[in-house]
Amino acid sequence: RYFWSRLSEGRLPEGLDSKAPLLGPLQRSLPGGYKFTAVKDLADELEWAKARRLDPSSYQAAVEAMGRTPPVPGDLFAGLFRRYERAKDRAGKIDFEDMLVRMLEGFETRDDVAEEFRGQYRWFSVDEYQDTNPLQQALLEAWLGERRDLAVVGDEDQTIYTFTGATSEYLTGFSRRFPEARLVRLEDNYRSTPQVLAMANRLLARTPGQPRGKRLVATRPP
């Protein structure tokens, strides 16, 4: 609330617990069989788009350029995106992505606010870094500024939220962006049996597009 008051006039709008109540009526208004598209798929696509700072006017061209297949045709989704934003504004609500976008805009447009925010936090630690999306990464970098006081923890083989825009590339490319960083490998496994880890290691060795060298080590007896 403090940060919002420094960036916007008026009180902080209420956050949406879920996009479903706003998306349900919009889903049912889609033509033909598209009205049966799962609301969750529509919500995931909204989060994917917002993670790339797309808006209804830029969405369709972006997905076509990327060769992405949305849950409904791009023109239909762009219209749904626009109606969702209007419904959200009428309800006086914001979603989680709106909060991140507003914070990032504050860093980008208000030097005084950026310096104030940066001064309140010196060290940053990010868990599950493999599930970071472009919007979150941009906000993290803006909050850091010129500092390098950052620790991240993640596993590129446990990336889950790619459907909403996350990518493990920020984790796997961390040492390139921060060449002075110290890498600590957490390979001792205290949960699984050696048999399970042997199978996991065989599968991981075949994972395409991932840096190798990881080998999980069992600490439990067979």
Language model features: what each stretch is:
Residues 1-58, 172, 216:
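Conserved P-loop NTPase-based nucleic-acid remodeling module centered on helicase motor cores
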Residues 6, 143, 177:
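Conserved catalytic core of Hanks-type protein kinase domains
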Residues 6-10, 26-33, 49, 66, ...:
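Alpha-helix C-capping/helix-to-loop hinge sites
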Residues 9-12, 158-220:
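Conserved coupling/interface region of RecA-like P-loop/ASCE motor cores
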Residues 29, 34-39, 67, 74, ...:
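Hydrophobic/basic alpha-helical segments enriched in Actinobacteria
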Residues 46, 68-173, 185-195:
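Conserved helicase NTPase motor core
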Residues 48-75, 79, 217:
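A contiguous, low-structure linker/loop signature
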Residues 50-59, 93, 148, 204-216:
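Proline-centered turn/helix-capping motifs that create local helix->coil transitions or kinks
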